[in-house]
Amino acid sequence: MDRRIFGLENEYGVTCTFRGQRRLSPDEVARYLFRRVVSWGRSSNVFLRNGARLYLDVGSHPEYATPECDNVTELVTHDKAGERILEGLLVDAERRLHEEGIAGDVYLFKNNTDSAGNSYGCHENYLVARHGEFSRLADILIPFLVTRQLLCGAGKVLQTPRGAVYCVSQRAEHIWEGVSSATTRSRPIINTRDEPHADAERYRRLHVIVGDSNMSETTMLLKVGATDLVLRMIEAGTVMRDLTLENPIRAIREVSHDITGRRKVRLASGREASALEVQREYYEKAVDFCERRGIRTGTVEQVLELWGRTLDAIEAEDLDRIGTEIDWVMKYKLIERYRAKHNMTMSHPRVAQIDLAYHDIHRRRGLYYLLEKRGQATRICNDLKIFEGKSVPPQTTRARLRGDFIRRAQEQRRDFTVDWVHLKLNDQAQRTVLCKDPFRSVDDRVEKLIAGM
């Protein structure tokens, strides 16, 4: 599939503290956060003018699902626009709290674990063709996804009985199955619940829930871009070496606990391979595939260059080569500098604080944004495009139809209901348009519905 629909869903951790002590329960904070949303949307589950969905997920986690995007750079921009929307809700919630005489700071963290050991996710969505064996797709993808954390892990200081260790991935400790239809109970690598949000005869939605949430724009680009290339190879019938893992769940933890990428994991064939070797296999196949097919877009070249350089840097133990582009490396360098300066062990509470503060989405507080201000975080988006993405949907996908419909209905103060595929006016006629093609950004039926308001 040369043109693919992508979507990202990020759940955010939330807390409110006063002088270091927890001030409100997550439920109470979430209520303040969403008060503005509920006042205009009459619900804590709404679709926005940019085509995205914003809602309160299980366990009081705000969740932002990007609109459908058909290129990876635009997807990263819309994910960042979601961060900005939530930052706006955070500032508004703090103001309301202070007006009511409740002192405290509200924090939203774009991470995947809280201090109690709970995990919440970043879910990636890739549209794939319905024909073809899904099990074959999953079999080839799983070794890639288990080792992909070397490219796009968010990094985590993990407290163990033997002391604290720095791990590549936050999510790795919380994955318990390879492929399953559950998302919370057993947490698989690939979720098989079949909800295509499109024509079910033609498409299915590959739902990957193993990845970490990313602060870095370049890490996000690499995560989705490399996965897209692997999918393209599978779809084209590229012959791949059998890298099936003997035990993917054990392997994902072993890979996460080794920042050198050299620890061997057992394959089902009885052989052993390191995460670097597995990734190198996929990377070299992808380079060859793109050369043979003449795939030469700027994004693909960017993805391949960063993919190769990341593997080279880890192999050479020269992390400075990717020190402004890969989340787990950026955070690791930040922690190591701080530890060296203050002569601290990895178990020190201040180190845990840095680990968390990296993911604070408040641009005046978060450590990732401090690095960005210092020019120590490479960017691929610009702030104007991100600002635009808060209210303007992607113009080349179904999101445009949804966004335009919502904008017009709100301007005309009309009651409406939307989801990923339906647009409905709640009037006497109950006019509804079903939009099954996510690639379609122009539709006479929708134009008519909008014109009739």
UniProtKB/Swiss-Prot annotation:
Record flagged with keyword tRNA processing: no
Pfam name, any one: Pup_ligase
Top EC group: ligase
Keyword annotations of the record: ATP-binding, Ligase, Magnesium, Metal-binding, Nucleotide-binding, Ubl conjugation pathway
EC code(s) of this entry: 6.3.1.19
Annotated catalysed reactions: ATP + [prokaryotic ubiquitin-like protein]-L-glutamate + [protein]-L-lysine = ADP + phosphate + N(6)-([prokaryotic ubiquitin-like protein]-gamma-L-glutamyl)-[protein]-L-lysine
Binding site for Mg(2+): E9, Y55, E63
One MF annotation (Gene Ontology) recorded for this entry: magnesium ion binding
Active site: D57
Example GO BP: protein pupylation
Pathway(s) it belongs to: Protein degradation; proteasomal Pup-dependent pathway; Protein modification; protein pupylation
Residues annotated for ATP binding in this entry: R53, T66, W420
Role of this protein: Catalyzes the covalent attachment of the prokaryotic ubiquitin-like protein modifier Pup to the proteasomal substrate proteins, thereby targeting them for proteasomal degradation. This tagging system is termed pupylation. The ligation reaction involves the side-chain carboxylate of the C-terminal glutamate of Pup and the side-chain amino group of a substrate lysine.
Family: Belongs to the Pup ligase/Pup deamidase family. Pup-conjugating enzyme subfamily.
Extra remark: The reaction mechanism probably proceeds via the activation of Pup by phosphorylation of its C-terminal glutamate, which is then subject to nucleophilic attack by the substrate lysine, resulting in an isopeptide bond and the release of phosphate as a good leaving group.
NCBIfam families membership: pupylate_PafA (TIGR03686)
Name assigned to this protein: Pup--protein ligase
